[in-house]
Amino acid sequence: MFYMTGQEYDVVVVGSGAAGMVAALTAAHQGLSTVVVEKAPHYGGSTARSGGGVWIPNNEILKRDGVKDTPDEARKYLHAIIGDVVPAEKIDTYLDRGPEMLSFVLKHSPLKLCWVPGYSDYYPETPGGKPTGRSVEPKPFDANKLGPDLKGLEPPYGKVPMNMVVMQQDYVRLNQLKRHPRGVLRSLKVGIRATWGKVSGKNLVGMGRALIAPLRIGLREAGVPVLLNTALTDLYVEDGRVLGIYVRDTTAGDDAEPRLIRARHGVILGSGGFEHNEQMRVKYQRAPITTEWTVGAVANTGDGIVAAEKLGAALELMEDAWWGPTVPLVGAPWFALSERNSPGSIIVNMSGKRFMNESMPYVEACHHMYGGQYGQGPGPGENIPAWLIFDQQYRDRYIFAGLQPGQRIPSKWLESGVIVKADTLVELAEKTGLPADQFTSTIERFNGFARSGVDEDFHRGESAYDRYYGDPTNKPNPNLGEIKHGPFYAAKMVPGDLGTKGGIRTDVRGRALRDDDSVIEGLYAAGNVSSPVMGHTYPGPGGTIGPAMTFGYLAALDIAATAAASRKG
């Protein structure tokens, strides 16, 4: 930790993910002295571990890349899927100010973005939804440009062999490697990119790390220090106003004395959710729940939420998360995307029955795993654990949990019981504890749907979102395939997440609010430490990062405006 006693800045930002970095970048360019403190030994948080997508309708990148959209369409879409869970003014503020924020970031950092063609909004058939997608993602970035700051960049989620850099738009094509010429061509493109990076001496990073690295350079050029291994312990208040934070050097042990960093004009919390806080998860979220199923950053233990609550901050949507059906593999959970959409697979509960469209958006899928409205109800979740069922043909054709098509399933996965293999469906039922008669009946009925191309029970394959990760060569439905080629497999599925959703209630300026909607002066929040503008839903790829960046930006602008007004006064 690069900490000196008696530090004072205009603005103190807690957390170095997208929310914190954009907030700090904005404050610095408003002429405010700014510091970022980060609890972890690396910067980037959950953003660096993510796909790096940014969902902001009508931004300059989408316009440049020829995406046809209007503010009215985007407004109609978001209001339809969010409903009245979130104030309309907050939704509209996000849509109105998000494009402005992104243009600012592109101007003041080396970040380069591009549209993700065809990566559909998650509810494209809803009025205003876009089957062609509204998501942008970072282009591969040479992390060597970070210089000495490279060692502090958050490691990637999953292994990246031989400097291979995969973008979101690559992943869907790579899943078609054995099925479509586009898969072969994309594989060649990714290989050429890796080779070019190696021979040219570049250290290419992709996805979330390609978003964070340019932001870090932007902060460096703006003169903003990032203090690693610096954990928030409490907020400092004078005369009812937040004017600083207490921090602890995490390398000095739990008994290290807290130190004060003063903030003349405000503190912005961008410290992430509480996905790695077992106590908070058990308190707020429905069973079964654990910190072992999340892929969020390990440092996210709700510190900002706890500190703000002490000052009377209202908390909202604490029961929810950015869920996704997850395979709890040995060592690290696997957040399943294409695995649920590829034909030749279904998900069943412990009764051997299907209970949802397996290909639906991942937050909603976990709501169905728990059961009830938005996953809420009495007692433990109704469909947990569930099992993803597939056959050898599926395994030979598609990527599964990072394994290439046809690649042998590691013995440790089988030995752990997370993946079960059997020669027959009846044997698979016995090994997984499923009722064989009901299970085989479910498979038989589903196979009929696969032959006809119509899922009469859950309409899988009817949405453009379903089809995005489907197999275009599989007829008559890209998401439905018979399960009949042994051996057969079952992969345990649990409600994992990218991070928790609930947090501090904020207004359109990012200010922290109490239960009566009064403002906690000097305190702001953005990202997963705050209650989401998206409510219980998820509009499209990048629907977490887009709001995090936007409300971090707006918080910094509000502090700058308040500071300017106080100087005039």
UniProtKB/Swiss-Prot annotation:
Keyword Heme in annotation: no
Enzyme Commission number(s) of this protein: 1.3.99.4
Effect of a null allele: Cells show an accumulation of 4-androstene-3,17-dione (AD) in the cholesterol degradation process.
Keywords of the record: FAD, Flavoprotein, Lipid degradation, Lipid metabolism, Oxidoreductase, Steroid metabolism
PANTHER family the record matches: 3-OXOSTEROID 1-DEHYDROGENASE (PTHR43400:SF10), FUMARATE REDUCTASE (PTHR43400)
Family statement: Belongs to the FAD-dependent oxidoreductase 2 family. 3-oxosteroid dehydrogenase subfamily.
Name this protein carries in UniProt: 3-oxosteroid 1-dehydrogenase
The species this protein was found in: Mycolicibacterium smegmatis (strain ATCC 700084 / mc(2)155)
